[in-house]
Swiss-Prot record:
Family the entry assigns: Belongs to the HscB family.
Organism expressing this protein natively: Shigella flexneri
Role, per record: Co-chaperone involved in the maturation of iron-sulfur cluster-containing proteins. Seems to help targeting proteins to be folded toward HscA.
GO cellular component, one term: iron-sulfur cluster transfer complex
Any one GO biological process: protein folding
PANTHER family assigned to the protein according to its UniProt record, in alphabetical order: IRON-SULFUR CLUSTER CO-CHAPERONE PROTEIN HSCB (PTHR14021:SF15)
Domain of life: Bacteria
NCBIfam families in the record: hscB (TIGR00714), PRK05014.1 (NF003449)
Protein name: Co-chaperone protein HscB
Gene that this sequence comes from: hscB
Domain J span(s) in chain numbering: 2-74
Single GO MF descriptor: ATPase activator activity
The protein's assembly and partners: Interacts with HscA and stimulates its ATPase activity. Interacts with IscU.
Keywords: Chaperone
Length: 171
């Protein structure tokens, strides 16, 4: 059973996050291992396995990039373990330049420039994220998979910039 079905939700990117949360809480109560403590060993094991599946499904569906990757996996794109990389050389060059810029910001300990950099990367991420949503809505799986690969780069870059921000603010 796929995660969307487990949660009683349609298999699409855009979800009712409140319904997702409520269903998660309901499933947790229903399959919590403590509820099966007096049951047979097989029932206890099944409850533990079901609880683990519910938790994994929850983590996957609530995180936007993980949800997109999972939805794509249902359509034959295993982005989590694939060796396929981004082939857009302009995008890759841009990523290298952004990484170099982040390194320069770190060397200079330039908080103002870092703040501007983070805003710029967030805007790039948001623009590409909106494109991905449209591609998934239109079932343009190949294009969406490529966009998700690019979003991974931007997400890592954003995370690195935010870690640098914390580091600079701690001084």
């Amino acid at each position: 059973m796929d995660y969307f079905t487990l949660f009683g939700l349609p298999a699409r990117y855009q979800l009712d996050t409140q319904a997702l949360s409520l269903r998660f809480q309901d499933l947790q109560r229903q399959y919590h291992p403590d509820k099966f403590a007096s049951g047979s060993l097989a029932e206890q094991l099944a409850a533990v396995q079901q609880s683990a599946t519910i938790n994994q499904a929850w983590q996957t569906l609530r995180h936007p990039l993980m949800r997109a990757e999972y939805l794509l996996s249902l359509h034959g794109f295993d982005l989590a373990s694939e060796q396929h990389t981004v082939r857009d050389t302009a995008f890759l060059m841009e990523q290298l330049e952004l990484r170099e810029e982040l390194d320069e910001i770190e060397q200079a300990k330039d908080e103002a420039r870092l703040e501007s950099f983070i805003k710029r990367v967030k805007k790039m991420f948001d623009t590409r994220h909106q494109l991905m949503v449209e591609q998934l809505d239109n079932e343009a799986w190949d294009a969406a998979a490529d966009t998700v690969r690019k979003l991974r780069f931007l997400d890592k870059l954003r995370s690195s910039a935010e870690q640098l921000e914390e580091k600079l603010l701690d001084f």
